[in-house]
Amino acid sequence: MKKAVVLLSGGMDSATTLAIARQSGFACYALSIDYGQRHVAELAAAARIGQSLQVSDHQFLKLDLAVLASSVLTDISATVPLHGTSTGIPVTYVPARNTIMLALALAWAEVLGSHDIFIGVTAVDYSGYPDCRRDYIDAFEKMANLATKAGREGMVLTVHAPLIDLPKREIIQCGMELGIDYGLTVSCYQADEAGYACGQCDACHIRRAGFEAADIPDPTCYRNKQIS
């Protein structure tokens, strides 16, 4: 069975991506990164998802990006903006995060003898991140094949981003068909330790709107019980 490294954050998109990789016949090796994010509950979610989808191995790496990559997601003293209050690239952008994570996935893939990496980025219904676009994924894939021993030896590495052109509604529908329990996932930028969501940030808004568009009950646990 072919091996694939799957970046697994603990959110909806990465969980769906893992399920797609598994459905595609890959033995999945999940990689989750503790980069100093304030919503650390997503790492517990990643562990639950990995167990639920029976990954072959699941590695958790600690890499404190707060030292070099300042963002409201890594600075607990900063305020996460409410949905609709940011313009341009949002303050929740973590500099070079996806590049760093893909590089780590690439290193593990080489060790495993894997030629496939999966990442759950999407360019539709997203919050304006520059590293969630198809041209970025294509550029990283080109670099990976230029900069690795496997690439130099003619073993082409592919970076799969199966959700990149899908709106959240279709992502949710796809995941439901694959049997994902989205109640295991955490999307909120300021989820508490128990995984309860704020219901007010961009991530919460996009998630909730996706379930509404898919006409599927939202399994998210919100701190404010009036949000549903």
From Swiss-Prot:
Q: What is this protein called?
A: 7-cyano-7-deazaguanine synthase
Q: Which cofactor does it need?
A: Zn(2+)
- CDD domains in the cross-refs: QueC-like (cd01995)
Name the InterPro entries for this protein. QueC, Rossmann-like_a/b/a_fold
* Assigned EC number: 6.3.4.20
Residues annotated to bind Zn(2+): C188, C198, C201, C204
The pathway entry for this protein reads as: Purine metabolism; 7-cyano-7-deazaguanine biosynthesis
Organism of origin is Nitrosomonas europaea (strain ATCC 19718 / CIP 103999 / KCTC 2705 / NBRC 14298)
Query: Catalytic activity annotated for this protein?
Result: 7-carboxy-7-deazaguanine + NH4(+) + ATP = 7-cyano-7-deazaguanine + ADP + phosphate + H2O + H(+)
Question: Does this UniProt record's set of keywords contain ATP-binding?
Answer: yes
Family the UniProt entry places it in: Belongs to the QueC family.
A Gene Ontology BP annotation from the UniProt entry: queuosine biosynthetic process
* Physiological role: Catalyzes the ATP-dependent conversion of 7-carboxy-7-deazaguanine (CDG) to 7-cyano-7-deazaguanine (preQ(0)).
Q: How is the cofactor bound?
A: Binds 1 zinc ion per subunit.
Q: Which residues does the record give as ATP binding sites?
A: L8, S9, G10, G11, M12, D13, S14, A15, T16, T17, L18
Q: Tell me which UniProt keywords the record has, alphabetically.
A: ATP-binding, Ligase, Metal-binding, Nucleotide-binding, Queuosine biosynthesis, Zinc
Q: Which Pfam families match?
A: QueC
At the top level of its lineage, which domain of life is listed? Bacteria
Q: Which GO terms describe its molecular function?
A: ATP binding; ligase activity, forming carbon-nitrogen bonds; zinc ion binding
